[in-house]
């Protein structure tokens, strides 16, 4: 299993003066962090946590243990800054992380009330449990979900990065099947939109995840936009569905002889200087794969390949 598409968006909202959210959308690593603290401390906390997470990915173990290790490393980074910088005293951040493995699973790590969801066959499932006061009261049966949504302390969280030297991290793995769409988001989205609305907006925009991210943010702002809003989206597909051989129909170019015609069944036969840029040694068929192309979109590769091919063919035709 591999990430097929990904997109992200963030917005200050309609009530806040600055955006204290940070996010990572760098397959196979995805994350959302919602900072808190006076002045610019919240923004600093979330950005520090995101930076530490990126650094920790390179050396962390695999699976749930690795995700916990990464998040605890981010916690230490934020806590150290809060203890040594008077202007950052009391700062903290939520953190929700998703890492896509090749074993048909997505590993989630979670601290705070930023959430992870999975959309499968039109059904939206909340994967994480909020670490918040009202969520705890709901779990104890002291509040109903409806009461929690309007409770005056609904934004009070019970866990965060940076507030203590260590932190409890919830980590687990979920199954991923082709077509699943995963959403990570800050509470600026979920306090404005219920699960039914989120599922409906996603369902209308599944063909374009960039549009889906923008649509979710716009919907939250339409409902009031009381907080910063961040969305990170990705979907997964089987590796065989992503890696594919690129076949280009024969092209007619001025000055090109019949014997030079490109035959689709043979793949694309390119001049050596162009071939080397797109295919593995020993192959004459261009195979596009997200891994060697450093996550470049397949559509952009196709355009670049066609443009380069046409230039070479025209140049050869004019030279005759």
Give residue spans per PLM region:
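PP2C/PPM-type serine/threonine phosphatase catalytic domain
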Residues: 1-320
């Amino acid at each position: 299993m591999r990430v097929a598409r990904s997109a992200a968006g963030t917005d200050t909202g309609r009530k806040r003066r600055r955006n204290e959210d940070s996010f990572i959308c760098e397959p196979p690593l995805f994350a959302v962090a919602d900072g808190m603290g006076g002045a610019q401390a919240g923004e600093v906390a979330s950005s520090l946590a995101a930076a530490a997470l990126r650094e920790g990915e390179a050396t962390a173990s695999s699976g749930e243990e690795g995700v916990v290790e990464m998040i605890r490393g981010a916690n230490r980074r934020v806590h150290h800054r809060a203890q040594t910088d008077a202007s950052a005293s009391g700062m903290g951040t939520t953190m929700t992380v998703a890492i896509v493995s090749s074993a048909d699973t997505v590993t989630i790590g979670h601290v705070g009330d930023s959430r992870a969801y999975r959309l499968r066959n039109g059904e939206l499932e909340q994967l994480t449990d909020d670490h918040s006061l009202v969520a705890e009261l709901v779990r104890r049966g002291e509040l109903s979900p409806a009461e929690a949504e309007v409770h005056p302390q609904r934004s009070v969280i019970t866990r965060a990065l940076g507030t203590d030297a260590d932190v409890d991290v919830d980590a687990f793995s979920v199954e991923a099947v082709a077509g699943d769409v995963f959403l990570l988001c800050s509470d600026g989205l979920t306090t404005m939109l219920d699960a039914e609305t989120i599922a409906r907006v996603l369902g209308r925009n599944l063909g374009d995840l960039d549009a889906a991210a923008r649509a979710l943010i716009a919907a939250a702002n339409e409902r009031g936009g009381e907080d910063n809003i961040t969305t990170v989206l990705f979907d997964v597909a089987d590796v065989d569905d992503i890696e594919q051989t690129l076949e280009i129909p024969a092209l007619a170019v001025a000055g090109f002889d019949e014997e030079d015609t490109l035959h689709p069944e043979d793949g694309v036969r390119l001049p050596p200087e162009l071939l080397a840029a797109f295919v593995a040694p020993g192959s004459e068929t261009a195979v596009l794969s997200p891994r060697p192309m450093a996550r470049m979109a397949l559509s952009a590769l196709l355009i670049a390949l066609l443009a380069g091919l046409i230039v070479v063919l025209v140049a050869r035709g004019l030279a005759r």
